[in-house]
Amino acid sequence: RRPPRSTPLYSSAASDVYKRQPIHLLINGDPDKKSFIVQPGHLSLVKHLNRPIEDPPKDSKTSWRRRQLAEYITHTDNPLTSRVIVNRIWQHLMGKGIVTTPNNFGFKSASPTHPELLDWLASEFVEGGWSMKKIIKMIVMSETYKQSSTHPNNMECTQIDPDNRLLWKRNIRRMDAEVLRDSLLQVSGDLNLKKGGESFYPSLAPEVLEGFSRKSSAWTPSPDKDQLRRSIYMISKRHLLIPFMKAFDFPSSEKPCGNRNRTTVVSQSLAMLNNQFIHSRSSNLARVLIQEHGEDEDAIFNAWKQIFSREPKPHELEASLKHYHKQQSYFSEKDNSRLLALSSVCHVLINSNEFLYID
């Protein structure tokens, strides 16, 4: 049961102590059946990776075991750590890693598509002081990153390299669930940028909580303002994934996920069309546009700029105005017909591939 919000939050953490505790080999894992004492050490199976654990300095207040392990992992003789990190950075920026099995760099892993590039990025990463900001800046400023998903010789290149292993164009991909939710909050002007604090509980339909014996205590929605925070602060439970996030391939927290599934299923379209969260974002954006822009055409023009960060082309603006007038006629008997019609336009725009996909 979730504690009251006024209760201080505590977290468990490991602490290092100077006095080393003897570690025994346990027979059949039974703590009451201790065998000989096992000394700490590195991987003895591989000779060049096996190093003794040194004793700490006399004035040290810790055993230095965890520090030596950290130094061992990040040592320049260890070729894996830096490569694993830059491969994950590349995967998040480009949509696909140089090694497509980010959790497995062993003998059964996929071979790197560009081994020289992986080695070079890893060396630049280490020489740059293991700075993720530097390596991210380097990648996003490259010609490879700035490519379009379309190519003037698209048909010819597709026949030669249909999987784009040679990176002759950008891999178009849909936004992750968290990025999509945050983007919707951003364009509607609803995003709460508060940092830190406890996680928030979003509102859920009663049907989602049917499996709980105590529905009221199992899930208490946070205040509306807190529910507009970034998705990184959203509560994540193993036994209950938020339906909207799950529809867009939000992974389960029951096991590590190095590479998310990217599905295209009907539940995603239904969520974007019918979910109350989506309709609220459309309505709030329309409300802001009406307040800031008096003319209908100006409001629709700025809706395009707000959602796509570009001005609409003449035929796009014409189609949007046509849809707006059609919806306004449909809602003519309602007092807020203009708001409803403009909300419909915004709803159509955020359902477009241009908004949902990173090109």
Segments from the language model and where they lie:
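Primarily short, surface-exposed interaction patches in extracytoplasmic proteins
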Residues: S12-P223, P251-R260, L273, H279-A341
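Short, solvent-exposed mixed-charge patches
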Residues: I358-D359
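Positively charged, low-complexity/disordered segments
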Residues: R1-A14
